[in-house]
Regions:
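N-terminal intrinsically disordered/low-complexity leader segments
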Residues: 1-16
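Helix-turn-helix
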Residues: 20, 28-66, 70
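Short, basic, alpha-helical segments at the C-terminal edge of helix-turn-helix-like DNA-binding modules
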Residues: 39, 69-76, 80-83
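Hydrophobic alpha-helical connector segments
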Residues: 66, 79-108
Length: 108
């Protein structure tokens, strides 16, 4: 049996579950790198069925977009730096101040 098959799922309100999934995804992206997360990893970390990730974020690309948006809001430098280094669409909207912080993070 896989880890996902051994996970017990608890029914939650959709907004709470979506936030739980996003929080787990942000944590994983910080630890493993933005490009290295998978739907299965996020499902296991958030104790959610992988189908819920599709329900709330449609695609892995949609989930990654939400991760970067959360990283911008929370100023999570490892995620922003990785996205900026691959010229991700989401970081094009960074404020000059935040972009400067990310560049400083990358150079230290």
């Amino acid at each position: 049996m896989s880890d996902e098959e051994n996970t017990t799922y608890i029914r939650m309100k959709p907004a709470i579950r979506k936030q739980q999934i996003l929080d787990a995804a942000v944590e994983l992206a910080t630890e493993k790198g933005y490009r290295n997360i998978t739907r299965k990893d996020v499902a296991i970390a958030s104790k959610s069925a992988s189908g819920l990730i599709g329900r709330y974020f449609k695609t892995v690309a949609g989930l990654k977009k939400a991760i970067v948006e959360a990283a911008i809001e929370r100023e999570i430098m490892p995620i922003l730096a990785e996205n900026l280094s691959i010229k991700g669409e989401e970081t094009k909207s960074l404020s000059p101040e935040l972009k400067e912080k990310v560049i400083l993070y990358l150079t230290n």
